[in-house]
A protein has these predicted regions:
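Helix-terminus/linker motif at the lipid-water interface of multi-pass membrane proteins
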Residues: 35, 39-57, 126-133, 189-198, ...
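Short runs within selected transmembrane alpha-helices of multi-pass transporters and secretion channels
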Residues: 77, 146-164, 172-180, 201-216, ...
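Transmembrane helical elements of multi-pass membrane transporters/channels
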Residues: 25-44, 145, 179, 208-212, ...
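Residue-level signal for short hydrophobic patches within transmembrane helices
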Residues: 16, 20-39, 43, 65-72, ...
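Small-residue-rich hydrophobic transmembrane alpha-helices
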Residues: 56-116, 153-172, 279-343, 374-396
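Short alpha-helical transmembrane segments in multi-pass integral membrane proteins
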Residues: 1-27, 84-151, 193-249, 305-370, ...
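Hydrophobic transmembrane alpha-helices of multi-pass small-molecule transporters
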Residues: 68-71, 183-188, 213-217, 289-292, ...
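Transmembrane alpha-helix boundary and packing residues in multipass membrane permease domains
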Residues: 30, 34, 46, 63, ...
Length: 462
């Protein structure tokens, strides 16, 4: 099949397949990828928790470093991916290659800078991310290999997102799932079999992510994608580079503020000891696993929304957003019901310490209610980002952490003590949902109006 034939087949699939079937077909491998990623994060928490409470706290500290890596990768991946998908929707394959190449090589450069700066200032960097003196040794050992692999990890996120936005979620899944399963297998081998302790968890993560990078790169080099990587295709136009940054600004804002929020959460919790840092870290990892289902469904929405918006099929964008909202909510209800009845056992699975459980259990129960509001937040943000509404998407992406969580974590612990630390995240989720909902409802109405205008061949602008 020629490149032109593959492009035509992909266009027909993205613009003609019934919305529920299309989203579920794209979401299923993405959900699996997200779950595997969350499982290997949980595996790190589980195995490191076998060492000590201080080592378990190091997982929470290094998760802020991972959020920085994800912020850079998602900024370039989502930023280029939304443009690539819309350009493919309008059948401009040359532009797709240009934006893909620019984001990939920029990711490598950003990763090198992060690795050099992070390794040169490692102890201070870990303290900045919320480490205590007793956690510091574990945090540095865990973070060092991850920083060395940062260029490949950021580039992998870019490739994964480009594949998804092209509608090739199955290919993206292969790289991520392979890396995740390897991470789970290598954790106990390096940590306990080779006696490397916390450093072994970092080495396992770095090695598995390097292999994932190789698999994803193979997909592009073997011509399995429409867009390609060529150094000669990197844009020389500052305007196009700024388009990538603008399109990825919501992801960068969301993940960057996640890192800052995680740092402030660690700092607030460390006032109550290593058990508090470990307890909040465990709760965060468990709920990241649950939330990965909603995010996975939302990522199934993104290429559908981008592609059909570029093809001016606005009714399909609207249908996709509504279906995703319903599907994500239904899945979360089932997961929360299971977790609610096994809450204490889940927490003890990661660290069987009464002090850790005493901190984590109330936070876990508060979060069970708040996470049911996440589908509104996820669908609103991902829809705006997918159709190129960078301003609204950036505001909403930054809203949860920047507008809601960070002010709360600075104030509530001073007023309510440890309970304030535990309540910050669920309150932030509730506030963000109430802010997001009017944006979503208004945009759904606008899509309906644009579709009517398109049907009558009248120009439609938002």
């Amino acid at each position: 099949m020629t490149q032109q034939d593959r492009t035509a087949v992909q266009y027909h699939k993205m613009t003609e397949t019934p919305i529920p079937r299309l989203i579920l077909s794209l979401a299923a491998p993405t959900i699996l990828s997200m779950l595997i990623t969350s499982i290997y994060n949980l595996a790190d928490t589980f195995f490191v928790g076998r060492i000590s409470t201080s080592a378990s706290g190091a997982v929470g500290v290094v998760s802020s470093l991972m959020a920085i890596i994800q912020a850079l990768g998602f900024m370039l991946g989502h930023g280029s991916g939304t443009i690539i998908s819309r350009r493919l929707g309008s059948q401009d394959t040359h532009a797709a290659t240009r934006f893909a190449s620019t984001s990939f090589f920029t990711a490598l450069a950003f990763g090198v800078v992060l690795a050099v700066v992070g390794l040169a200032t490692l102890p201070d960097f870990m303290m900045l991310l919320g480490s205590t003196e007793t956690i510091l040794l574990h945090a540095c050992a865990y973070a060092r290999p991850i920083l060395l692999a940062a260029p490949l990890m950021i580039s992998s996120l870019v490739m994964n997102n480009i594949l998804r936005y092209e509608g090739k979620a199955n290919l993206a899944m292969i790289g991520l799932v392979t890396g995740g399963l390897l991470n789970i297998a290598l954790d106990p081998l390096f940590m306990f079999g080779l006696g490397l302790g916390t450093a072994g968890a970092g080495i396992a993560t770095a090695l598995s992510q390097t292999i994932s990078f190789g698999i994803l790169l193979y997909m592009f080099l073997r011509g399995k994608t429409v867009s390609q990587f060529r150094l000669s295709a990197v844009t020389r136009e500052p305007r196009e580079f700024l388009q990538i940054l603008a399109g990825g600004a919501p992801s960068f804002g969301r993940q960057g503020l996640n890192s800052i929020g995680g740092m402030l959460l660690n700092i607030a919790a460390r006032s109550y000891g290593d058990a508090a840092v470990a307890g909040m870290s465990i709760v965060s990892r468990i709920f990241m696993f649950i939330l990965s289902v909603a995010i996975g469904v939302g990522q199934g929405l993104q290429p559908v929304a981008s592609f059909n918006y570029g093809a001016r099929k606005y009714h399909r964008v609207r249908q996709a957003a509504i279906f995703t909202l319903k599907a994500a909510f239904a899945l979360l209800v089932v997961l929360i019901a299971v977790c609610w009845w096994n809450d204490e056992n889940l927490i003890r699975l990661f660290r069987d310490d009464p002090e850790v459980t005493a901190v984590a259990l109330p936070a876990f129960r508060y979060q069970c209610f708040a996470i049911l509001l996440q589908p509104v937040i996820v669908v609103t943000n991902m829809t705006f980002q997918s159709v190129g509404k960078a301003g609204r998407a950036t505001f909403l992406a930054c809203c949860r952490q920047g507008v809601c969580f960070i002010p709360l974590i600075l104030v509530l612990p001073r007023v309510l003590g440890l309970v304030g630390v535990e309540l910050c995240q669920p309150i932030a989720d509730a506030l963000t949902c109430f802010i997001s909902l009017p944006f979503l409802l208004a945009f759904l109405r606008q899509l309906e109006q644009m579709d009517k205008a398109e049907a009558s061949h009248a120009p439609a602008q938002l």
